[in-house]
């Protein structure tokens, strides 16, 4: 309880039994990063609903896991059954080469001399795109997208910063 509000926090899947109007914040699992000079994983998608009537009913809560690394894998979706039409989409994977993962927020592209890859796209209303990798000898990977901003592009020797989160 905080300031008269009851807070239910789920770090794994379970059941929610509310009795009134609630504010919901649903976050999906983040994407995994790639190896070497690869890009960073994107943040899990974020859905916020500040005034949702829930009534007296059981809801199944699914908490998405983060994506594995080396190679990067997309994060898993999070949802509350019967409340929202869309799930919070898992974050996109960062890549060493090829296309960065799309997701709640996109993964960062890999840096390579043979052609850096673009960052992955984010899901509208949930997150932002990842940054591109840098084309240079030992070019660095891009930062993963965040819920509040796009990931930065990689530089000659340093990876791009991840996108900012939301307050």
Where do the PLM segments sit?
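Glycine-biased low-complexity/repetitive sequence motifs
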Residues: 1-167
């Amino acid at each position: 309880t905080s300031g008269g509000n009851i807070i239910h926090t789920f770090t794994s899947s379970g059941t929610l039994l509310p009795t009134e109007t609630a504010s919901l914040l649903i976050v999906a699992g983040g994407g995994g990063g790639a190896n070497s000079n690869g890009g960073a994983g994107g943040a899990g998608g974020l859905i916020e609903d500040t005034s949702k009537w829930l009534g007296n009913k059981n809801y199944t809560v699914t908490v998405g896991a983060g994506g594995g690394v080396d190679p990067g894998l997309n994060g898993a979706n999070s949802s509350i059954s019967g409340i929202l039409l869309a799930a919070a989409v898992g974050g996109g994977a960062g890549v060493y080469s090829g296309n960065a993962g799309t997701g709640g927020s996109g993964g960062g592209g890999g840096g390579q001399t043979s052609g850096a890859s673009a960052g992955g796209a984010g899901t509208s209303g949930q997150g932002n795109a990842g940054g591109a990798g840098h084309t240079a000898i030992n070019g660095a990977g891009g930062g993963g997208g965040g819920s509040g901003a796009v990931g930065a592009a990689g530089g000659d020797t340093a990876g791009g910063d991840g996108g900012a989160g939301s307050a």
